[in-house]
Design a protein with these regions (language model features):
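Conserved interdomain linker/interface between the two RecA-like ATPase lobes of SF2 helicase motors
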Residues: 282-342
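Walker A/P-loop
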Residues: 125-147
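Conserved strand-helix element at the start of the C-terminal RecA-like helicase core
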Residues: 157-168, 319-328, 332-359, 475
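Post-DEXD/H (motif II) to motif III coupling segment of the RecA-like Helicase ATP-binding lobe
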Residues: 234-297
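Conserved helicase ATPase core of P-loop NTP-dependent helicases/translocases
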Residues: 189-201, 355, 367-403
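Conserved Walker A/P-loop ATP-binding site and its immediately adjacent core
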Residues: 139-144, 148-149, 154-177, 348-350
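Conserved segment of the helicase C-terminal RecA-like domain
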Residues: 434-469
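Conserved helix-turn-beta segment of the N-terminal RecA-like "Helicase ATP-binding" lobe
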Residues: 166-192, 363
Length: 490
């Protein structure tokens, strides 16, 4: 009889004749997008195939359902799973905690139904990815799940991975806020880790950036964790985070949280293997319809330039970011709504972000214009967040990399895409910056700028115009309101 057994909490093994393993392997393997451009493929060092199961039948535990389904489709339904090896089979359900939860002012928070649903799903399945949009309250979902695990007495060491130092601080602060009335001060059970900080503690919960711990050589460090959470899970297919999760060989509880997953087989297969199947608890549109998030209005603005011969993407971007008329137009958008705050997102720090910041600072001496990029320290970024939260007429000029995720500013009304992007994750996470409810706003606005260099004779679309059309398609699929405008920039 065929059997599926556990190697550890990261990997499982299909015990079967080589012929059957090869069948499964051939069905599950696939070529990722753009494989032909990979240097290893070009050099003949890689066949261009992603192989979720190896020649010995070993696969990531999160792919258990996929392997079982493939076996059954091939007619091998007579297989056995050692249920003692897989936590979802042998461990009884854990009940959600009934702790009293509060906000910063000590007011009682009643979790939304979708938050409780997410926690219950995580506690029942013990592996998987919770998909909830920005503003859905993922930190509360993590908090409730962790408290439930600790109360069960079955989990002694819990690791929470976040992508940035700012998120380490923010999540710790959120945990402390939620415990305002229940006596569970974060400092008494949460250990924060960042570069240069002590990696070990007697406390049960560690919050860390993956950058701070991925190069730890001592295997026992990762073996101490019996539960792992991965915030902003869409970043977890990087080799460093994969290495961490593979090393957590005793972490039988694994939950990821994200607002969006890439529509890419390589990405989804990797994350499913590391963490498990995904569960979408709600959508941005549903939360707006329920009044939990602010309604969104999108102004899609196409700037019609003189025809430009086809150039490489980098050269096209160089033209766009150095276009003085375009940058002045971006500045003019910040004059549309008095006493509101603006977030201007850019891609290139030296070529675009800093020149925009300098221009805005000179043009609007009575406004607070604040620059954010990777050079700005975490504590300064946190201070910028607080300034924006407490004031009006603030303009944040920030790089996508620093402000697309994990920044919580309720008093933010407008977002401007000063640089184009085609990344679905980047687009939706950036939009989410402005959707949190605040007494000063009834609507959040996105100004999505794009550039058309095709003219009348050119047959092919320029790169950033094609990316703009992809974004419009994304907005339409989400049923967002879009106002389309064309402006002559010739």
């Amino acid at each position: 009889m065929l059997t599926i057994t556990s190697e550890n909490e990261s990997f499982a093994r299909l015990n079967a004749p080589r012929q059957i393993i090869n069948q499964i392997k051939e069905i599950l393997q696939f070529r990722p997008d753009g494989y032909m451009f990979n240097p290893r493929f070009k050099a003949g060092l890689w066949d261009g195939l992603i192989k979720p199961i190896d020649g010995h039948g070993v696969f990531h535990k999160g792919l258990l359902l996929k392997v079982c389904k493939t076996l059954e489709e091939l007619g091998y339904s007579d297989y056995a799973i050692n249920e003692k090896d897989f936590v979802q089979f042998y461990e009884p359900a854990i009940n959600i905690t009934n702790l009293e939860i509060t906000d910063a002012d000590g007011n009682i928070i009643q979790p939304h139904d979708y938050q409780e649903s997410a926690v219950n799903w995580a506690l029942e399945n013990k592996r998987g990815i919770v998909i909830a949009p920005t503003g859905a309250g993922k930190s509360l979902i993590i908090y409730l799940t962790i408290q439930s695990l600790l109360q069960s007495k079955r989990y002694k060491k819990i690791l929470v991975l976040v992508p940035t130092v700012s998120l380490t601080t923010q999540l710790f602060s959120d945990f402390d806020e939620y415990s305002h009335s229940n006596g569970l001060k974060a400092e008494n059970y949460v250990h924060k880790i960042s570069s240069g900080k002590d990696k070990q503690s007697h406390l049960p919960v560690y919050i860390s950036t993956w950058q701070s711990i991925y190069n730890i050589k001592d295997k026992s460090y990762f073996e101490q964790f019996d539960a792992v959470f991965v915030d902003e899970t869409h970043t977890a297919d990087s080799s460093s985070i994969t290495q961490i999760l593979n090393s957590c060989t005793n972490a039988r509880f694994r939950i990821g949280l994200t607002g969006t997953l890439k529509n890419c087989k390589t990405h989804i297969t990797a994350l499913t293997g590391l963490l498990g199947e995904s569960y979408q608890v709600t959508t941005t549109k549903e939360l707006m319809d329920r009044g939990i998030l602010t309604n969104l209005e999108i102004s899609a603005i196409l700037l019609k330039h003189a025809e430009l011969p086809k150039v490489e993407y980098k050269d096209e971007m160089d033209i766009i970011v150095a276009h003085s008329k375009r940058n002045k137009f971006i500045a003019s958008i910040t004059e549309l709504h008095k006493d509101e705050n603006y977030l201007i997102l850019y891609q290139y720090v030296q070529k675009h972000g800093k020149p925009l910041y300098e221009y805005l600072t000179k043009k609007y001496p009575n406004k607070q214009v604040l620059l954010v990029n990777g050079e700005i320290k975490a504590e300064v970024r946190e201070n910028i967040r607080k300034i924006t939260e407490q004031n009006n007429n603030v303009i944040i000029v920030a790089s996508y990399q620093t402000y697309q995720q994990g920044i919580n500013i309720k008093n933010l009304h407008n977002v401007i895409f000063a640089s184009p992007s085609k990344s679905m994750i980047r687009v939706f996470q950036s939009i989410g910056r402005a959707l949190r409810k605040h007494s000063s706003k009834n609507v959040a606005r996105l100004y999505d700028l794009a550039d058309d260099f095709t003219g009348d004779k050119r047959k092919t679309k320029n790169y950033t115009l094609s990316h703009f059309e992809e974004r419009i398609q994304m907005y339409m699929e989400q049923d967002f309101k879009i106002k389309y405008t064309e402006l002559d920039f010739k």
